[in-house]
Amino acid sequence: MECIRVPKGKKLLILLTGGNRMNSIWKETSGSVSFELLNGVKSTDVLIVGGGIAGILCAYQLKRSGIDCILVEADEICSGITQNTTAKITLGQGLLYNKMLHRFGEDKAKLFVKAQKNAILEYTKLAKDIDCDFETKDSYVYSLDNRKKIEKEVDALNIFGIEASFSEARELPFSVAGAVRIKGQAQFHPLKFLYEIAKDLPIYEHTKVINLIPHKAVTNHGVITFLKLIVATHFPIYNKHGAYFLKLYQHRSYVIALKGAPHMKGMYVDESDTGLSFRNYDDLLLLGGGGHRTGKKGGCWQELEEFAKEHYPNAKIAAKWATQDCMTLDDIPYIGEYSKNTPDTFVATGFNKWGMTNAMVASKILCDLVQGKENQFADVFSPSRAIFRPQLVLNALESTIGLLTPTTPRCPHLGCALKYNSAEHTWDCPCHGSRFDEYGNLIDNPAADDHHSFK
């Protein structure tokens, strides 16, 4: 497929010239930016490790606050999970809010909602000056078979002051029991936005952190000393602290971009982890789904292609790609101090498939915390909050099974047995989500290096 970029303001045109590209449409329809690699010794107040949306927004907020910072990225910025998003900016993150109301109480749940709402407002304000295809949209979370759950979710959101209502979601190509409609949400082109945000930031690409010691990072191209550290590497890179290998697991999902499918006015997501999501970009319909825990079997692209063939028989697949998300134990991201034993080190992870909204939340919280300021949302998102959920037991069980499985190859992260993913021709870790290509090259962390036994 060849992506032809046309002048600003004209319609996007994608021509298929054989095969389906595995790059996201964001990668295919944005320009490029590049940054030099580190050379020698640098010093900064705040070092940010990770050049995805969370790291870039943290650097942006810090620079705007007059704080000296440096961001390092092992590859190129936005080359990981960020480029594979469906780019919805919304409170509609599944059926969260009735559950939160009863689990955490009204006060804590209201703070979570307020943080999300503030993030959407911040995007809206920033996007006024950036050509990033930003659009205000209504967001819908639908259920195939449980109207009562939808009604309870609407009631919970109304308690929190959010304008939510019950909808029959008639735009969908199938009938549903109902949907939560939330007005005033948004979608955008993430790379157009981030490339503009990043262009004046102190960023070093192809600069991989090899060793972290207190207030010093050793990279493949030099050394950086710092006062404070923000880890924004998708899955945190410290194994010794924070127990993130137990508090997180990774979930894989798939997207196809359909040309010739009907245009949808809203953004839609199933309340089920295994359901489908829908949003338009220009003349393409982005259909997401096929999800599964990384290292397990799932519907993958085949499920999406079969659905498209049945419901959109005249549509053509213009592109397809996959993404991966860190999932927490209680549906709330981990944003704040990395652990109680690591002062001056902070983390942003576990965005639970909603990285666009929660990355902005993280940037605002961490910008305050690294300056020693209080933040009203810090306790809600604190990585050290008391958590004991059934998922913790499941994560520990997966790790135990992975360690005891008498097969090779094994993941260099913590030694779990890798599983072959025939849909993507990769080796995936069911314990913590590391992924390698067929030659052992690292694709996704938390593993830090290639699998050398494949070479």
Whereabouts are the PLM-identified features?
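Flavin-binding catalytic cores
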Residues: 261-264, 292-325
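N-terminal Rossmann-like FAD-binding beta1-loop-alpha1 element of flavoenzymes
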Residues: 46-71
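C-terminal catalytic lobe of FAD-dependent flavoproteins
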Residues: 315-392, 407
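Glycine-rich FAD pyrophosphate-binding loop
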Residues: 64-84
